[in-house]
Amino acid sequence: MARASRSIHARKKRRKLLKEARGYRGTKHTSYKRAKEQVWKSGVYAYVGRKQKKRDFRALWIQRINAAARRHGLSYSRFVHGLRLAGFDLDRKVLADLAVSEPEAFGAVAAQAKNALEGRPVERRVELGGAGR
């Protein structure tokens, strides 16, 4: 029985890896060893980046909410506390979007949070405005 040669599989494997490494600078796109190291490291960076993306967006949403809340005389922490007291269950992503795209609706929510902080009864039915809603 003839000896099995790995040359076809090995070449295919190397070609596949070098294809993944296209666009890398220096030896990292031509040398198999360096390309292999860089492709692996790129995977690590991508994994970490996916986790960081979540943190970065949360921080951005908080900054936007804070800026909008301060326009209505509340700090971010007091605004969020007021929302909890008022019984609002809106996440930061929705609040940030509201603050950017519909400031008057955010103002209505901020007024409800302010009322809850001051101990006034909270209106359960609030019209947030907007056409066709």
From Swiss-Prot:
Keyword Metal-binding: no
Single GO molecular function: structural constituent of ribosome
Gene Ontology cellular component list: ribonucleoprotein complex; ribosome
NCBIfam families (alphabetical): rplT_bact (TIGR01032)
InterPro entries linked to this entry: Ribosomal_bL20, RIBOSOMAL_L20_CS, Ribosomal_protein_bL20_C
Keywords, comma-separated and alphabetical: Ribonucleoprotein, Ribosomal protein, RNA-binding, rRNA-binding
Protein source organism: Rubrobacter xylanophilus (strain DSM 9941 / JCM 11954 / NBRC 16129 / PRD-1)
Listed name of the protein: Large ribosomal subunit protein bL20
GO terms classed as biological process: ribosomal large subunit assembly; translation
Functional summary from the UniProt entry: Binds directly to 23S ribosomal RNA and is necessary for the in vitro assembly process of the 50S ribosomal subunit. It is not involved in the protein synthesizing functions of that subunit.
Superkingdom field: Bacteria
Recorded family membership: Belongs to the bacterial ribosomal protein bL20 family.
